[in-house]
Amino acid sequence: MKRLILFFITMLSGLFPMQVSAQSLSNNYVQIHTYLEAGNASKRMDQIQYFDDLGREEQLVLKRFAPNGQDVVSGVQYDGYGRKWRELIPVQSIYSTGSYISNLSEQAARFTGDASPYTEIGYEDSPLERVL
C-alpha cells in the first residue's frame, strides 16, 4: 500500500512541475543589492557580476546606473593562459535590464568611437609572469 501511494504521489508531481530558477542557463552570476536609503526599497543600486565557466569574472553590470536609466557595463577578457589580458572600459549599455551582453567589445567600440576601448595588460616573458 505504501508503494502504491508513493507511486501516485510521484506520478502527480510529474504532472505539476515546479519552476525554480537560480542562474540563467548560459551564465553564472551574483546579484548584489545596495540600499541607498534606509526604509526605502525603491532607492537601491543593483550590481550583477557574470562569471565564465571557470569562475572568473567576465562582466560587471551596474543596473540602471547611467543618468538616463541605462546599464553601465565593464568586462574582462583572458588570454590563453587564463591571465587577465584586456579590461574593457565601462560603457553605457543599450539595455536597462541588467542582462549579459555577448558582444560587449563591439558595443564598447561603437559607444566610444575607439577601435580599442580597453586596457591591455602585458606580462614579462619569465616564469614569474610579472605585470609590465
What is each of the regions a protein language model found here?
Residues L6-L15:
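Bacterial N-terminal signal peptides
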